[in-house]
Design a protein with these regions (language model features):
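Carbohydrate-active catalytic/glycan-binding domains of CAZyme proteins
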Residues: 1-182
């Protein structure tokens, strides 16, 4: 299967739902044409028919904050609500994405004829309502205890930080900002 738009399909995700195999793909390269399309078949090996609503996720507005949406994976909550987790970028001057690819989440609704539609085909949402009760990531009452020369796991970072500008003395953590490229 060469994708709906036949332009660089990649990153497939399969979902079996209600007797259908759904194939979610990223298409259009990783630039401004990046999008999520879906096709389905009654059998795993196809023939797959493209969704009449494709692309089910794409940013159509060139000045919108979220761009380059692709690589969507559908997920269902324990309450039966559907969402799509996907990659995107927040662009600066329509050229750069300071944080690279970010992860986003938007709701999926299913049409009466069984097709997934993301965010009512309005493109990526900037905010979503939380369907679950808030669970704090950390306790506000927790004592971080800067009494040692080491930071606890609560201060882990997704990248290897430079340790320049970080000091722990007399139970006080001091962080000095720096000029650094991401």
């Amino acid at each position: 299967f060469y994708g709906d738009q036949k332009r660089a399909p990649e990153g497939p995700h399969l979902l079996k739902k209600d007797g259908w195999y759904y194939l979610f793909e990223a298409e259009g390269g990783t630039g401004e044409g990046h999008r999520i399309t879906v096709s389905r078949s009654r059998t795993l090996m196809g023939i797959y028919e493209p969704c009449p609503y494709n692309p089910i996720m794409r940013q159509w507005l060139p000045d919108a904050p979220i761009q380059r949406c692709g690589h969507g994976k559908p997920v269902m909550t324990q309450h039966g609500d559907w969402y799509i987790v996907y990659l995107c970028g927040r662009m600066i001057d329509q050229k750069y994405s300071m944080l690279g690819r970010e992860t986003a989440l938007d709701p999926i609704t299913w049409t009466p004829d069984g097709w997934p539609v993301v965010n009512h085909l309005q493109g990526p949402g900037c905010q979503q309502k939380k369907p679950l009760p808030e669970i704090p990531y950390y306790s506000k009452d927790k004592d971080t205890g800067f009494g040692t020369n080491f930071l606890s796991c609560d201060f882990m970072t997704p990248r290897t930080p430079t340790l320049h500008g970080i000091q722990i003395q007399n139970g006080i953590l001091t962080l000095e900002g720096s000029h650094a490229d991401l």
